[in-house]
């Protein structure tokens, strides 16, 4: 009798491809929710994203066990970690009915990031033993920074929801009444809290990065492109939060600031990473 082989020998990249496919399916279904004005409580996107998270988690776990360290060592792994954070927090928020539609706004971002991460140059093949790890601080500072970017990504999703709801209230009042999206006040509160949490993670990541740099280079700061870039991002979000705290910004301006800042992070992170001598030490050595 012929044996049926189970897909237990799939590579981590195969699991990740399957997860990205599910994110794409969620994105396509989300188009119908957008067109209907989010007037129906729907579990489909939530369920598809949950399935994607399971596959995504398996992919990251397999990569981590193979490396025997936190799997954040190149652009593919960093992108996958950011995506995982966004999906996980989205599913937790989706427990509450009014925030279940966050997935409809997050799925396009997840699909685009997933396709981008699968580009061949994002995950170069290295010889056995090519990875170098320097203990807990190495994994800690990467994890904190990636978690913070995931939090900023979720706040940007909240900003899109806020701007969508605000537009409906102005242009399509009847559709806004029937919509199951949260109120503008709740969305603004959620945005603000997400930015504060992500900012705290970014601050902790900067401290851990400085400690890690001192561990390996005996200096607390180095004029590296990525370090300067992260400090610039930190300063921008600090100003954004201070202005929001003092009620200088309206909810609409805060939403645009949150969305614009994350788009800046999304579009510039990859280039800065490639320009960073600290993160391209292996390439310089070769």
Segments from the language model and where they lie:
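General secondary-structure edge motif
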Residues: 8, 127, 174-177
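Hydrophobic cores of alpha-helical transmembrane segments in multi-pass integral membrane proteins
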Residues: 11-126, 144-167, 186-215, 222-286
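Residue-level signal for pocket-adjacent positions within structured domains
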Residues: 65-67, 132-133, 182
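Juxtamembrane inter-helical linkers in multi-pass membrane proteins
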Residues: 169-185
């Amino acid at each position: 009798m012929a044996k049926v082989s189970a897909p237990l020998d799939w590579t981590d990249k195969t699991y990740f491809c399957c997860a990205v496919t599910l994110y794409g399916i969620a994105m396509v279904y989300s188009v119908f929710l957008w067109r209907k004005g989010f007037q129906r409580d729907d579990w489909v996107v939530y369920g598809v994203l949950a399935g994607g998270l399971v596959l995504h988690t398996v992919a990251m776990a397999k990569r981590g066990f193979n490396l025997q360290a936190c799997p954040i060592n190149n652009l593919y792994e960093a992108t996958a970690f950011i995506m995982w954070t966004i999906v996980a927090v989205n599913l937790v928020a989706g427990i509450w009915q009014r925030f279940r539609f966050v997935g409809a706004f997050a799925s396009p971002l997840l699909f685009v990031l997933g396709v981008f991460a699968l580009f061949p140059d994002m995950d170069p093949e290295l010889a056995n033993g090519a990875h170098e790890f320097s203990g807990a601080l190495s994994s800690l500072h990467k994890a904190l920074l990636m978690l913070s970017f995931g939090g900023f990504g979720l706040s940007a999703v909240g900003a899109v929801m806020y701007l969508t709801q605000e537009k409906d209230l102005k242009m399509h009042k009847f559709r806004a009444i029937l919509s199951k999206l949260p109120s503008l006040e709740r969305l603004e509160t959620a945005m603000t809290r997400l930015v504060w949490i992500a900012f705290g993670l970014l601050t902790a990541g900067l401290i851990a990065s400085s400690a890690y740099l001192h561990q390996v280079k005996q200096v607390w700061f180095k004029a590296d492109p990525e370090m300067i870039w992260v400090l610039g991002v930190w300063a921008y979000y600090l100003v954004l939060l201070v202005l929001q705290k003092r009620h200088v910004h309206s909810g609409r301006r805060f939403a645009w600031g949150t969305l614009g800042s994350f788009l800046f992070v999304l579009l510039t992170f990859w280039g800065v990473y490639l320009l960073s001598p600290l993160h391209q030490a292996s390439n310089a050595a070769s």
